[in-house]
Amino acid sequence: MKAFSVTCLGFAVFSSSICVNINILQQIGYIKQQVRQLSYYSQSSSSYIVVKLLPNIQPTDNSCEFKSVTQYNKTLSNLLLPIAENINNIASPSPGSRRHKRFAGIAIGIAALGVATAAQVTAAVSLVQAQTNARAIAAMKNSIQATNRAIFEVKEGTQQLAIAVQAIQDHINTIMNTQLNNMTCQILDNQLATFLGLYLTELTTVFQPQLINPALSPISIQALRSLLGSMTPAVVQATLSTSISAAEILSAGLMEGQIVSVLLDEMQMIVKVNIPTIVTQSNALVIDFYSISSFINNQESIIQLPDRILEIGNEQWSYPAKNCKLTRHHIFCQYNEAERLSLESKLCLAGNISACVFSPIAGSYMRRFVALDGTIVANCRSLTCLCKSPSYPIYQPDHHAVTTIDLTACQTLSLDGLDFSIVSLSNITYAENLTISLSQTINTQPIDISTELSKVNASLQNAVKYIKESNHQLLSVSVNSKIGAIIVTALVLSILSIIISLLFCCWAYIATKEIRRINFKTNHINTISSSVDDLIRY
């Protein structure tokens, strides 16, 4: 119980009651990998971000003329011009057309979209709808143009939160403006040119898909981070009421952006950002496990448990998370994907080994070891475990399913020729002798589709061959059957003719005998008649 209580304390930050016995499960090859907090999200609102791509330069005493800014302005104009033209083509109806397609009362230039999916048309509708907020966008534009503040908020009657970001201005404020009077114009111009050149390279790289069609290509995570610059955490905190870090929200792809306007005169880009609503279920943990083979009842086996489970209080479910977004510490889902576990699986997760089910392993390509917090958990009965420092072979007893190798046992470990450095101590305080009955091992090998298809194809080819041979045999049998039928018919007719002949002979013999008998009686009667006549005459 001591080891189990230690495991519970390890998860106390997430939940007050943890039933999964991590230590016992690790001894049978079921190793915990990651614990994540479960959160649900939905796209519910949007905000507009105004990005000023050309910074304000504080006037200097020596009136420096920064040629780098002029060149940067020219290059950036060439970069943004295709985006602005593309947006205008999509947001404006096609010229010369009397009838325009309308979505929610807004005219869209369908010809500018080309072949587009439903999602892309929806994105175009979103772009055009953003044009209706021209007053709010203009207010943000005019506000940001004359200020050196990197972030501020503007609220309209719709209570939509708009955040204006100057990605370059933050750097100008903290570095450049403090040194303007202490450096020559040439040095300042060179330093500014270097910074602007790097930023321009970054913009060109991350916005390359936007040059094709900004309405149909959402802004990538890299583009959002590039736009926001060092202001990313502040923007996320201002738009989302959550304690989750900005890095995790962006890496999960929960914030999606779309360029809706480009103002070439002011060198500003207006981006619509879809802001998700995030709700965290405080007592719900999603635990990832990694299964390796174990030595059970003198054979290599693997435990039959799901790779990911959801634990809420004292209950566990299988949790595939097929449609979720995973980060290091959180898992974001639009709905709950939990699936029920059998009672035996729950008992097994709780550390009741007698309720666990194992499947025998067939084949040599199997997961036989895993790195865990600087230690190695391996099935040393199915692979060669050799400690190189100090040098000795590692033996796994029959009553141990796997072997945990930490710094006290080995410093440099070789597993079938692969070398690992052990840097940590194992947190397992005890290891018990495992007793697993033969009835707990069942055959649940997954089907190798390619192999089975090859077998089926071979069987079909053999079947076709046998069918051809069978048809040939049937043809020969049918011919022989005709000849046999003729012979049998002849024999039957011959027998019938013999029988008829015998019957005819018998009938002829009987008829002849009967005729003779009748003739004899007739002669006898005639003799008697003659005698009677003679007697009468006498």
From Swiss-Prot:
GO terms for biological process: fusion of virus membrane with host plasma membrane; symbiont entry into host cell. Residues 128-156, 452-477 form a coiled coil. Residues 1-19 form the signal peptide. The chain crosses the membrane at residues 483-503. Residues 103-127 are annotated as: Fusion peptide. Residues 20-482 are extracellular. Disulfide bonds join 324-333, 348-356, 380-385, 387-410. It is a single-pass type I membrane protein; Single-pass membrane protein. Glycans are attached at residues 56, 73, 182, 352, 427, 433, 457. InterPro entries: Fusion_F0_Paramyxovir. Residues 504-538 are cytoplasmic. It is found in: Virion membrane; Host cell membrane. The keyword RNA-binding does not apply. Class I viral fusion protein. Under the current model, the protein has at least 3 conformational states: pre-fusion native state, pre-hairpin intermediate state, and post-fusion hairpin state. During viral and plasma cell membrane fusion, the heptad repeat (HR) regions assume a trimer-of-hairpins structure, positioning the fusion peptide in close proximity to the C-terminal region of the ectodomain. The formation of this structure appears to drive apposition and subsequent fusion of viral and plasma cell membranes. Belongs to the paramyxoviruses fusion glycoprotein family. The 2 coiled coil regions form a stable six-helix bundle. This is Fusion glycoprotein F0. The lineage of its organism: Viruses, Riboviria, Orthornavirae, Negarnaviricota, Haploviricotina.
